[in-house]
Regions:
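C-terminal regulatory/interaction module of P-loop NTP-utilizing enzymes
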Residues: 1-310
Length: 310
């Protein structure tokens, strides 16, 4: 990895790059294309696994909290991979999400358009229903994992509006007068994540198993160990120093705190530059090399460089 001439764009060279073949040898960071791919490398803590197994056993949703980048979403994909029941049915909560968005969609516009064109009678309303995440999970021939991701983004009533549906695993469709329910043995396993410290309604919390993912050095070490081939050439002491710098950065008041994935990319860049780093990691945080890999906010970078706001 260290034979790659990192400084390809170089003003001091004074002329265009002569050896274009090096462009074909760029050691790209291998970003996975999906959460499912990342699940193979996800490293859960023991307490997280206990919480997952508890929620599965008692049939209650697992509510996972934690700061961004701690692996809340990945926990659901890891569980699905580990249980051999992929893919995860993923519902991404939005600021305008309603409980019904998780259940089904009725195409009212198309229904009334078709009804207007009919000379007699009315269209079959069941033809205008679209199954959404919970309905799909309930109809699966095997128990599935349903992920309700970032529930804190939803309107305040969203959690309470799902109390019956998540508790009984059934819901009513007034348009067709249908009661949809899951077979007891096929009850979906529900994972719910939240980034916010805003407290969810008490009735909702009472129906959940709860786990908070605390970002810590042990879990980061395990994540690095899983990918150790990517960091060939870096000594254990160097990696430990990099981790210390990373955690020192995370302790600062930042607009966007760097995550595990950003640390792993940063470590890969450091591995490419081993032996030629212009800066030392044991210096002040303002001198961290390649800080743009870790921080993605201009003001954060400026504050770190100035030592301000800390």
């Amino acid at each position: 990895m260290t034979d790659y001439p990192f400084q390809l764009v170089n003003y001091n060279r004074g002329k265009p790059l002569e050896d274009k073949s090096v462009l074909f040898r760029r050691p790209f960071t291998q970003h996975s294309t999906s959460f499912a791919e990342d699940s193979r490398l996800f490293v859960p803590g023991d307490e997280l696994e206990i919480a997952i197994n508890t929620a599965i056993a008692v049939g209650e949703p697992l509510l996972i909290t934690g700061k961004p980048g701690t692996g809340k979403t990945q926990a659901a994909y890891y569980a699905a991979y580990n249980l051999g029941i992929e893919p995860v049915i993923h519902f991404q909560v939005k600021s305008d999400s309603t409980a019904r968005d998780l259940l089904y969609h009725f195409d009212t516009v198309r229904y009334f358009h078709d009804a207007h064109l009919m000379k007699e009678g009315l269209p079959d309303k069941s033809h205008y229903l679209e199954k959404r995440a919970l309905w799909k999970a309930m109809l699966s021939d095997i128990p599935r994992i349903l992920l309700i991701d970032e529930i804190d983004k939803a309107p305040r009533d969203f959690p309470n509006d799902l109390l019956h549906e998540l508790d009984k695993m059934e819901f009513f469709i007034p348009e067709t007068q249908q009661l949809i329910s899951a077979a007891k043995e096929n009850r979906p396993m529900v994972f719910i994540t939240t980034n916010s410290e805003r407290r969810l309604p008490e009735p909702f919390l009472r129906r959940c198993v709860y786990h908070h993912i605390e970002f810590n050095e042990y879990l980061l070490e395990r994540a690095v160990e899983k990918r150790k081939k990517e960091y060939a050439g870096l000594s254990k002491d160097f990696i430990k120093m990099a981790m210390q710098r990373f955690f020192a950065l995370r302790e600062k008041t930042l607009r966007k705190t760097p995550s595990t994935s950003e640390f792993l990319v940063w470590l890969r860049v450091l591995a490419l530059r081993i032996g030629t780093l212009p800066e030392r990691l044991d210096q002040d945080l303002s001198k961290l090399p390649y800080i743009g890999v870790l921080l993605k906010d201009h003001q954060d970078i400026e504050d770190v460089k100035r030592g301000g706001r800390f």
